């Protein structure tokens, strides 16, 4: 039997629009068998799978104005124009200002995948929610780490960049991961 999936592309602020659509889907009980995200779409997907209505849009409308989120201050402190550790660590971890409901994310029957680009090979790597751990969101960081604007993110001894570099709309290879 075929599975029905949701593919969430990246694109930074374009994903603010997607965040509103995802909230409308949650309001109307729309679900999928799986969700696969790339770049900022991977972050939107995590909140959608967890059922956290409103969480995504807060990152694009409220948190974006915070000092550690984006800009010269973040770049000078971390080497990243986007404060990936601030966004997916300080804000997202259990004690953060806008924590991911990791238990709901893991318990959701919806499968979840994200794409990151292997910095050495340039090939896409697909991670599932089974690869993720509470308060360790390096997989999402990796999927969002834009080359030249961010340093690569290390996971298990390998370095990764934004998944959009190698598979910007992960439709063709979805059969290999689902």
Model-derived regions, located:
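Patatin-like phospholipase
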Residues: 1-38, 46-178
């Amino acid at each position: 039997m075929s599975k029905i999936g949701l593919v969430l592309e990246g694109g930074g602020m374009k994903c603010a629009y997607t965040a509103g659509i995802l909230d409308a889907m949650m309001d109307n009980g729309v679900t999928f068998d799986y969700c696969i995200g790339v770049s900022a779409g991977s972050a939107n997907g995590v909140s959608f799978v967890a059922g956290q209505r409103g969480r995504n849009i807060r990152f694009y409308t409220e948190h974006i104005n915070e000092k550690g989120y984006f800009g010269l201050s973040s770049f000078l402190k971390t080497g990243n124009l986007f404060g990936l550790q601030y966004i997916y660590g300080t804000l997202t971890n259990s004690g953060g200002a806008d924590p991911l409901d990791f238990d709901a994310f893991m318990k959701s029957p919806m499968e979840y995948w994200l794409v990151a680009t292997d910095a050495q090979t340039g090939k896409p790597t697909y991670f599932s929610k089974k690869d993720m751990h509470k308060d360790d969101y390096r997989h999402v960081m990796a999927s969002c780490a834009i080359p030249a604007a961010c340093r690569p993110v290390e996971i298990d001894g390998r370095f990764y960049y934004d998944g959009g570099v190698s598979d910007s709309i992960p439709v063709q290879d979805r059969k290999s991961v689902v």
